[in-house]
Amino acid sequence: MARLLFRLLQEANSTSPAEASPPFNSDLVLILAVLLCALTCIIGLIAVSRCAWLRRIASRNRSDQTHPPPVAAANKGLKKKVLRSLPKLTYSPDSPPAEKLVECAICLTEFAAGDELRVLPQCGHGFHVSCIDTWLGSHSSCPSCRQILVVTRCHKCGGLPGSSSSGPEPDTRIKQREDGPDNLP
């Protein structure tokens, strides 16, 4: 094998100048080939990234039209079924659970006799039904104390507790609140 290479080199050196091709620099050819490959790769990457960018914009436009943007879970609000399950009561200034309820912290209006109130079970704060329903539609916490509102399901049936205005739950929570902050559940 070495002899064959040696003979080829001798024949290449012994060729006449008239028959020899014009000299060229092999380093220049190698540099041009590398640059051509790099240019092809760069153009390919640009094409792929542009396609990905256009697909992302198209999917974002489609999702904006069909779905609202995602919101953090804490500020998502409560479902209407859960809102309806929260207890209501009719305000009467002389009734025991309503003695500490003076005004709605949302609209800042004093409660009048006959106003329909919703008392939050976790903290015992009371608000006008329309005010608190609007608030809880976009928030899941009490507007006064910011306590997260958690409605527990019935252990027997798995459903939400009924919304009765005469249930013991709101009265008990309000009475505990009247006794002092140390007695809160």
Curated annotation (Swiss-Prot):
In this chain, the RING-type zinc fingers fall at 104-146
Q: Which UniProt keywords apply?
A: Membrane, Metal-binding, Transferase, Transmembrane, Transmembrane helix, Ubl conjugation pathway, Zinc, Zinc-finger
A GO-annotated cellular component: membrane
Q: Which family does it belong to?
A: Belongs to the RING-type zinc finger family. ATL subfamily.
Signal sequence coordinates? none
Query: What PROSITE patterns is this protein classified in?
Result: ZF_RING_2
Primary subcellular site in the record, as a coarse category: membrane
User: Which residues are listed as membrane-spanning?
Assistant: 28-48
User: Can you name this protein?
Assistant: RING-H2 finger protein ATL8
